[in-house]
Amino acid sequence: MSARPTVASGRRPDRISGPALLKIAIVKLSSLGDVIHALPVAHALRGSRSGIHLTWIVEAREYALLAGHPDLDSVVPVDTRLWRRLIWRPAGARQVVGKVRRLRRRVRSARFDVAIDLQGLMKSGLLTAYTGAPIRIGFSADRCRERLNCLFTNRRVRPPASAVHVVDQYLSLLAPLGVTPGPVEFHVPLLPAAERRMEDFLGEQGVKSQDCLIAINPGAGRADKQWPVAHFRALADRLAQEPNARILLLWGPDEVHMARQIRDGLQARAILAPPTDLHELGALLRRTALMVANDTGPLHLAAALGTPSLGLYGPTRAERNGPYGRHCTGVQSPDGTMAGLAPDLAVDAARALLAARRDG
């Protein structure tokens, strides 16, 4: 039996019970991978009782992932990135103050009963406080990314030692509500039109239903999380030798040059993905037999969709931040650098995932 999370405030659980409509706000702003990792929290709350109205406060850039999500009743987008750009412009500070005030009025008028801060930052703490919820749950100070975040919460949780992965750490914040999560589930709805467009694209590339489509995403949000292009090329050449394998190179903003460098140096022909939005990317990932990527949003999107996924890790810990799921694994660099992660290690892990998929 795993240890129970510690409620640092010392209060007894505010159990989710009673006939009244309970209004809960989840505050998890970014990034894409982190928001995906928090999806099981929404699903656990939705299944905890009837009569819940669930709202998620999220950055505008990640809004598309949550819009129309079956576990949510509403989504409130905020654009703190825009606020940071505006603040340095003439009259920009006044604009930001106006936007913040309107947001505060909007969330305060919802009259939330509970707010759950999964981010642990000052900005997420402020938004949690803006809700005016009498129960405001967050991490204990020693587990917050910014310790002053705990000033804005009144139910503070220290995840148990058994909650190694960030998904399990997020779920531990439900303890003050007396919610015991069941099996972890990710719900990622995709638009049928996006799936049709991507099926048409793959058909144009000659991809057949029996082909083993292997997606490789070479981009990363930070330079120190970026596996060298030469390593990706070596990996792709080896995986292209798998039965019926087709290599699909994915890319995001400012990353197409890396995908082209990999493609142009390969012995086998690879498919360069078209520009995609979030739903189109998801449609491609749902179609693939394996996803290989750095610790980045597309990797975690693939895992959430049930696609076998291999994450490549250097400075971040695979056991905490790796792709979460049955047919998912992370390979850790022995020296903490991405360059120190040899292609052979990634090839062996990828082949093991492909073999497990073939064996069912």
Language-model features and meaning:
Residues 1-360:
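Catalytic machinery of carbohydrate-active enzymes
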